[in-house]
């Protein structure tokens, strides 16, 4: 539909401009400006221009829908709502109108209206409509009808676990904790009950039932040594004398918000477009502003589509005393880094080390930010602290050793780097990134080439579609003098990552080694065309590529004092 709107507007603007009245031309121009802004995911600009077009042509259904969609994407549902109600009253209201009017009725706690709307044709979709109706029946006080609605939905294939999860939450929201726990205990909630929110909901339910030891065991089983302020607060409450409150879904409006959050998470896991997922997360955020998990999801979606300032605005809404404050600040730092504001990101993370200095994730994030700025010494200190704070039982410790190893390697500390990589492999023996990095490093040093080959072959087996790892395999075969075998691997690597200068350069070297000089020169020229002079971290060496084009690889190796190709594998 959106594409059709764009094509229609293009026809209006390009083929009908001569005969259209001036006002119609202005409306079409504003609409096209809105479309251009929407393509950039600039929701504020698109809402502005669509609004101008709509003001000039209030009855145009395309202008109306586009304006509502832009306002919903921007999170301005209050402004979108009256326009969506106009759409809903038309002959063809569409899904966007149902999304916004449903949000409006839920916000107003018009449960009778929601129940009546669900009986109409159309709607958002059968699962969302069905769950919203069930929660509306909870809000209307008709628990019998609500439970019957949940049960009816649960007979349909595909989403039974999510339906039963919501049924458990609905029971808990009205105080039937025994009924809610029975659903969780029977594992009827499926994967939804195993998410972080699902586990915390069940822990709170067990706390309401006075089964604190079971709740504590569930936390340990689910999160192990991975703790954070929210989990720490929950543990403290369970170990104390008071009763743990059920906060996950306190009422029916929160339940409807959870429907939209649940489906946003499902859609994202199914690789739906971030723009589409954002519509659902925006509604959840509108209905429940304190839904921190949805806030973090919304910010992440905005960051992924390049709307860094909007993402930062969302994250700044989390107060400093909220248990999720550190997560929001980590997200804000990530958005600042992606918006080319690394110094500000580092400032945020440094402040976080002062306010939340006991969290390993804070120090590791600072290490990553410093490493990206080539401040390897400071990065190593941050990784040191993160490793010190991370329990030995945490299986994710390998990431810290891997990151520190990279920083050590960039400083030229070969022994320390290799030691960290090998420690990472002791923790996670088949981790392809570590196997590849260490194997490739050994190849570049001309050491332990047989061991390097074994490591990289294992890495390729684990990640066969990673062009960089396949390149490493081709390169070690080349260094071992197994040139014909290297060709197949290098060609495969370039198929996977066609525009990388290093991979194309490597393929050129391999072609030269088997006598395919013209193809080698072609690859070196391709490699040169892909070199980014602004990329200081790239291994690409354009001067060496040019020299190879001038005199050939054999002459370059001789100039460098390297072994000729026929003897390249002599030292292992």
Protein language model features and the residues they cover:
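Residue-level detector of the short coil/turn that links helix A to helix B
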Residues: 41, 75, 109, 141, ...
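Generic helix N-cap/helix-start motif at coil->alpha-helix transitions
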Residues: 24-30, 57-64, 90-99, 121-132, ...
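Residue-level recognition of tetratricopeptide repeat
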Residues: 35, 69, 103, 135, ...
């Amino acid at each position: 539909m959106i594409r059709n709107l764009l094509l229609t507007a293009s026809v209006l603007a390009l083929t009908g401009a001569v005969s259209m009245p001036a006002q119609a031309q202005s409306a079409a121009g504003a609409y096209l400006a809105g479309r251009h802004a929407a393509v950039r995911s600039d929701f504020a600009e698109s809402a502005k221009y669509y609004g101008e077009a709509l003001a000039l042509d209030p009855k145009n259904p395309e202008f109306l829908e586009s304006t509502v969609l832009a306002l919903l994407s921007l999170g301005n549902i209050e402004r979108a709502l009256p326009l969506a109600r106009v759409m809903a009253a038309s002959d063809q209201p569409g899904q966007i109108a149902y999304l916004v009017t449903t949000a409006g009725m839920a916000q107003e706690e018009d449960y009778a209206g929601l129940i009546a709307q669900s009986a109409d044709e159309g709607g958002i979709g059968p699962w969302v409509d069905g769950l919203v109706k069930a929660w509306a029946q909870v809000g209307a006080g008709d628990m019998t009808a609500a439970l019957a609605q949940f049960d009816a939905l649960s007979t349909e294939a595909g989403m039974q676990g999510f339906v039963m999860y919501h049924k458990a939450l609905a029971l808990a929201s009205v105080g039937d904790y025994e009924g809610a726990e029975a659903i969780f205990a029977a594992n009827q909630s499926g994967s939804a009950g195993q998410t972080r929110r699902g586990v915390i909901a069940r822990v709170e339910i067990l706390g309401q039932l006075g089964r604190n030891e079971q709740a504590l065991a569930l936390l340990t089983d689910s999160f192990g040594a991975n703790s954070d302020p929210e989990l720490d607060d929950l543990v403290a409450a369970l170990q104390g004398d008071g009763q743990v409150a059920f906060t996950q879904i306190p009422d029916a409006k929160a339940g409807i918000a959870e429907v939209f959050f649940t489906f946003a998470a499902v859609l994202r896991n199914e690789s739906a477009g971030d723009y589409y997922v954002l519509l659902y997360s925006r509604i959840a955020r509108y209905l429940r502003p304190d839904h921190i998990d949805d806030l973090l999801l919304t910010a992440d979606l905005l960051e992924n589509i390049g709307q860094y300032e909007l993402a930062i605005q969302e994250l700044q809404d989390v107060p400093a005393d909220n248990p999720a404050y550190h997560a929001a600040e980590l997200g804000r730092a990530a958005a600042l880094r992606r918006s080319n504001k690394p110094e500000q990101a580092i400032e945020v993370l440094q402040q976080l080390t002062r306010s939340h200095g006991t969290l390993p994730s804070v120090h590791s994030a600072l290490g990553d930010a410093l490493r990206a700025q080539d401040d390897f010494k400071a990065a190593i200190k941050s990784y040191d602290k993160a490793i010190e704070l991370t329990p030995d039982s945490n299986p994710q410790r390998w990431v810290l050793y891997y990151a520190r190893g990279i920083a050590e390697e960039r400083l030229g500390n070969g022994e320390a780097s290799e030691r960290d990589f090998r420690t990472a492999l002791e923790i996670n023996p088949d981790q392809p990134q570590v196997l590849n990095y260490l194997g490739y490093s050994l190849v570049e040093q001309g050491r332990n080439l047989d061991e390097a080959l074994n490591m990289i072959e294992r890495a390729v087996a684990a990640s066969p579609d990673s062009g960089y790892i396949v390149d490493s395999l081709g390169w070690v075969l080349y260094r071992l003098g197994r040139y014909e075998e290297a060709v197949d691997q290098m060609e495969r690597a370039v198929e996977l990552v066609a525009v990388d200068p290093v991979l194309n350069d490597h393929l050129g070297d391999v072609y030269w080694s088997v006598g395919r000089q013209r193809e080698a020169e072609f690859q070196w020229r391709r490699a040169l065309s892909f070199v980014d002079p602004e990329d200081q971290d790239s291994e690409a060496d354009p001067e060496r590529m040019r020299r190879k084009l001038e005199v050939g690889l054999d002459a370059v190796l001789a100039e460098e004092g390297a072994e000729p190709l026929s003897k390249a594998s002599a030292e292992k």
